[in-house]
UniProtKB/Swiss-Prot annotation:
Record key words, sorted: Initiation factor, Protein biosynthesis
SUPFAM superfamilies (alphabetical): Nucleic acid-binding proteins
Source organism of the structure: Methanocaldococcus jannaschii (strain ATCC 43067 / DSM 2661 / JAL-1 / JCM 10045 / NBRC 100440) (Methanococcus jannaschii)
HAMAP family: aIF_1A
Protein name, per record: Translation initiation factor 1A
A Gene Ontology cellular-component term: cytoplasm
Amino acid sequence: MAEQQQEQQIRVRIPRKEENEILGIIEQMLGASRVRVRCLDGKTRLGRIPGRLKNRIWVREGDVVIVKPWEVQGDQKCDIIWRYTKTQVEWLKRKGYLDELL
């Protein structure tokens, strides 16, 4: 019997440039819903997990996330918008979205 390998379609959320979203990697957990995030633009920001996502997404060091910098202090602070799963991170690597970050 010949095994057929079918590639499953994966829907992956991409950062929206028009909404000022950036890819980032969690570097350190700080507590009180705060994390240190290394962003794709080369800056390290203090990330906040908003209350609406606090119990829905659990983040760990090394997770790839989408962040949205604040309008005030945008170079220093941001909000976590989305966390990627392992299969989504593999897809992002294959497509070249994480080349500069990793």
